[in-house]
C-alpha cells in the first residue's frame, strides 16, 4: 500500500498485476472476493496450479478501452492463477475486462493525472509469445518514458 501511495503522490505510472490489482483496489477503498471458487456462482477455474502459464479462460473487454486497443479486440484469452478478485470497485477505478463468470480482469484509473492499469492475469509469464502481453509492457514503458521526460523537463525548468 505504501508503494501505491508513493506512486500516487508522485503521479508515477502503475502496472498492477494479479495481487497488484487486488492491492490497488483495496488501496482505493474497494473490497475483494476472498475465494472465487466458493463465492462466485458458476465460477471458472481461476487457480490453475502448476499450469498457470497456459491461457485458461477468455475475457470480454470494453470496446475502445486501453486493453481493447492493445489487444486489437474485445475478446482474448489469458492465463489465470488467483483465488481472490475485485468485488466492490475502488474509487476512481473503472473495470474494462471481465471473465465469463463476471470476475473483473482489468481496471484503469479514471483520473487523468496518473496512468494506472491493473490486470488480474500474469502478462509477465509467457510474454515472449503473447502479443497482448508485449503490447501491455510496451505501452507501460512508453508511458513511463513520457512521464520521466516530463519530470526531467519540469525539474530542469524549476532549477533555472
Where are each of the predicted segments found?
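Amide-donor transfer/coupling interface in amidating biosynthetic enzymes
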Residues: 1-10, 37-160
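Catalytic nucleophile loop
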Residues: 4-31
Amino acid at each position: 500500500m505504501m508503494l501505491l501511495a508513493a506512486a500516487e503522490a508522485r503521479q508515477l505510472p502503475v502496472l498492477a498485476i494479479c495481487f497488484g490489482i487486488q492491492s490497488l483496489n483495496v488501496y482505493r477503498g474497494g473490497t475483494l472476493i476472498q475465494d472465487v471458487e466458493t463465492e462466485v456462482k458458476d465460477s471458472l477455474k481461476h487457480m490453475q496450479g502448476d499450469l498457470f502459464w497456459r491461457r485458461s479462460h477468455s475475457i470480454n473487454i470494453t470496446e475502445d478501452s486501453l486493453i481493447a486497443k492493445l489487444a486489437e479486440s474485445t475478446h482474448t484469452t489469458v492465463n489465470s492463477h488467483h483465488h481472490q478478485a475485485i468485488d466492490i470497485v475502488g474509487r476512481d477505478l473503472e473495470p474494462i475486462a471481465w471473465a465469463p463468470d463476471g470476475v473483473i480482469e482489468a481496471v484503469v484509473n479514471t483520473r487523468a493525472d496518473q496512468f494506472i492499469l491493473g490486470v488480474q492475469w500474469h502478462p509477465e509469464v509467457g510474454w515472449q509469445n503473447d502479443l497482448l502481453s508485449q503490447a501491455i509492457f510496451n505501452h507501460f514503458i512508453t508511458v513511463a518514458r513520457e512521464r520521466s521526460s516530463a519530470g526531467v523537463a519540469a525539474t530542469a525548468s524549476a532549477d533555472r
